[in-house]
A protein has these predicted regions:
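Glycine-rich, basic loop-to-helix element that forms the pyrophosphate-binding segment
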Residues: 55-73
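Short aromatic/hydrophobic "clamp" motif used to bind/position activated sugar donors
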Residues: 78
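A short, conserved alpha-helix in the catalytic core of glycosyltransferases
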Residues: 138-141, 145-185, 190
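Active-site-adjacent helix/loop segment of glycosyltransferases
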Residues: 167-220
């Protein structure tokens, strides 16, 4: 299967290992470790032969980190994952089944078995749905239909970057789907080690305010 996994991490610890272990070793994984910790890079690449851990020159955030990884992708498809996501059985295979059904798409998203959805019941309704936007914890990218927009806007360090991307894709009539038959587990709010909870909370609050301001200025 023509796929590369992309994960952006910042001292994600055991959470990241749990994510990697849910991915079949035959798929290459590019990890952007935004903490720029050489020991983490060495540890990951030693434990997992399919992992290429890249240390950027500075913390690039979610958008910049993903863009750096996506610039290295040579496959036709990429699966963007948060570190706090675990793939359910046959998840990747089901992405390709759906990709062969909808063909000309930009993004396909799964559902998280932990989350509720406003417009449908993912347990009862398994039909593929075209949607306006998806949540960024897991996104299956059709690379040829996203390269034109340069993927994420680097001005979003954290938050709203996937909403912005989906909005730009829709303006070019690029389709976005969610498929309830594709399932992951998303343990939201736990993408880093507990020791840095307080500074990470302060950082998240600041970036939420900035991203909200920038998004509204950009699109209104």
């Amino acid at each position: 299967m023509d796929l590369t996994i992309v994960i952006v991490s910042f001292k994600s610890g055991d959470i990241l290992h749990r994510c990697i272990k849910s991915i079949d070793v035959k798929f290459p994984i590019i990890i952007i470790e935004n903490s720029i910790d050489q020991n983490l890079k060495l540890d990951l690449e030693k434990k997992y032969p399919n992992v290429n851990c890249i240390l950027p020159r500075e913390n690039l955030g979610y958008s910049g980190g993903n863009n750096l990884a996506l610039s290295k992708v040579k496959t036709d498809f990429a699966l963007i994952l948060n570190p706090d996501v675990v793939l359910e059985k046959n998840c990747i295979e089901n992405f390709f089944v759906t990709a062969n059904k909808v063909l000309d798409f930009g993004i396909i998203a799964p559902v998280s078995v932990e989350e509720r959805y406003d417009n449908f019941d993912p347990i009862k309704d398994l039909n593929i749905k075209e949607v306006e936007n998806v949540k960024g914890f897991a996104m299956f990218f059709n690379m040829k239909n996203l390269k034109w927009c340069n993927f994420f806007d680097d001005n979003f360090f954290l938050y709203l970057e996937e909403i912005d991307l989906c909005k730009r894709l829709r303006l070019k009539n690029t389709k976005i789907f969610i498929d309830p038959s594709i399932k992951v587990r998303h343990f939201g709010g736990s993408s880093h080690i507990p020791e840095i909870n307080r500074p990470m909370e302060l950082s998240r609050n600041w970036h939420w305010m900035w991203s909200t301001f920038y998004f509204n200025k950009k699109h209104n």
